[in-house]
């Protein structure tokens, strides 16, 4: 793709970089942001980065700047705090109605809600004694259908089977 075509997606790409590559402990300065954009075939000048960050801030994104040596920009506010994501991961892993495969998929999706660095902290194993994981891959869909029926005020019938 020619570099000029990449300019249309520059603002969104810059936001994705800040979401994935920054947190309070991992900052990116303007030259690093320019380099990461260039890796995505997007040309950027130093002045345009400042303008783009101002635009993102005006759109409600909490992008902070730490000045001085080792300083740079980071996305300060996210939908979930890291501690909240850890709680959700623990709940998913401890749930007996969620299969190990589905747990892994859900945790991977939760990792996308924080920086790459914080995401590695979500890879933890919770063991609940005496609570086996379900083998059913369709159990979540069944639970969702049950909730939908209850919310719609519909009658629900169960058919039990052994094993």
Give a label for each model feature.
Residues 1-90:
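Short, basic/aromatic recognition patches that contact phosphate-bearing ligands
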């Amino acid at each position: 793709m020619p570099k000029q075509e990449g300019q249309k997606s520059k603002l969104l790409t810059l936001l994705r970089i800040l979401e994935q590559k920054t947190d309070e402990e991992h900052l990116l300065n303007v030259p690093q942001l320019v380099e990461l954009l260039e890796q995505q075939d997007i040309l950027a000048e130093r002045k345009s980065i400042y303008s783009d960050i101002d635009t993102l801030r005006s759109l409600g994104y909490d992008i902070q700047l730490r000045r001085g040596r080792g300083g740079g920009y980071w996305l300060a506010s996210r939908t979930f705090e890291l501690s909240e994501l850890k709680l959700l991961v623990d709940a998913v892993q401890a749930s007996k109605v969620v299969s190990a495969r589905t747990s892994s998929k859900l945790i991977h999706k939760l990792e996308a809600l924080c920086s790459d660095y914080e995401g590695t902290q979500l890879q933890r194993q919770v063991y609940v004694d005496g609570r086996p994981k379900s083998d059913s891959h369709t159990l979540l869909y069944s639970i969702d259908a049950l909730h939908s029926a209850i919310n719609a005020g519909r009658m629900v019938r169960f058919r039990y089977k052994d094993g």
